[in-house]
C-alpha cells in the first residue's frame, strides 16, 4: 500500500465527473487499499478516487470511532436510488478543502446500490452520519464539493483563502 497525494481546491480535476468502473481487478483493489491508507493517514473518514487524481467512481469510508476497531467500507459505482425527505445538519469537512468546515443539510437516509471491494453487487440503507458521508463522497464523483452548497460569498472567500494557502506552500517548496 502507498500514500497518495490528496488534491485540494482550487483544482480543475476535483470538478471532473468520475467515470464508471468497468472491471474490478487487483489493480483497482490496490487503488482502494491506497485510498484507505491515505484517508487514515490524513486523517479523514471518507475519500473519493477523484481526490487522489483518479477519475473513477470509487469511494472509501470508515466512520467507526477512533478508539474502536476500524470498519472500512468500499463503494464502487455507488448510486443513490432513494433519499429521505427528512434532513439532518452536520458540520462537514473535506480533505480537499483543508481547514474549512460548514454546516450542510442533507437527507438523513439514503439507499445506495454499489459494488463492494470484490465486485459483488450490494445495497445499503444508510442513516445519519453514514448517509451524510456517502452523499458527500458521491458528490465528489460528480465534481461537487460541500462548499458548493454555501452562499456565493462564503464559497468565494473559502476558495480565495485556499488559493493563498497554496501559493504560500508553493513559495516554501520552491
PLM regions: where:
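Positively charged
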Residues: 1-174
Amino acid at each position: 500500500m502507498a500514500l497518495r497525494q490528496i488534491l485540494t481546491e482550487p483544482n480543475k480535476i476535483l470538478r471532473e465527473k468520475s467515470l464508471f468502473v468497468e472491471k474490478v481487478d487487483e489493480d483497482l483493489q490496490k487503488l482502494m487499499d491506497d485510498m484507505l491508507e491515505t484517508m487514515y493517514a490524513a486523517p479523514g473518514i471518507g475519500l473519493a478516487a477523484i481526490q487522489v487524481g483518479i477519475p473513477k467512481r470509487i469511494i472509501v469510508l470508515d466512520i467507526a470511532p477512533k478508539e474502536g476497531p476500524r470498519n472500512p467500507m468500499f463503494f464502487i459505482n455507488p448510486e443513490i436510488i432513494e433519499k429521505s425527505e427528512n434532513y439532518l445538519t452536520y458540520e462537514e469537512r473535506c480533505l480537499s478543502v483543508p481547514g474549512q468546515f460548514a454546516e450542510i443539510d442533507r437527507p438523513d437516509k439514503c439507499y445506495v446500490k454499489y459494488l463492494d471491494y470484490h465486485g459483488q453487487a450490494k445495497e445499503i440503507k444508510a442513516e445519519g452520519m453514514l448517509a451524510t458521508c456517502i452523499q458527500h463522497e458521491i458528490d465528489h464523483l460528480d465534481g461537487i464539493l460541500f462548499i458548493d452548497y454555501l452562499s456565493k460569498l462564503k464559497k468565494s472567500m473559502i476558495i480565495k483563502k485556499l488559493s493563498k494557502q497554496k501559493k504560500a506552500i508553493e513559495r516554501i517548496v520552491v
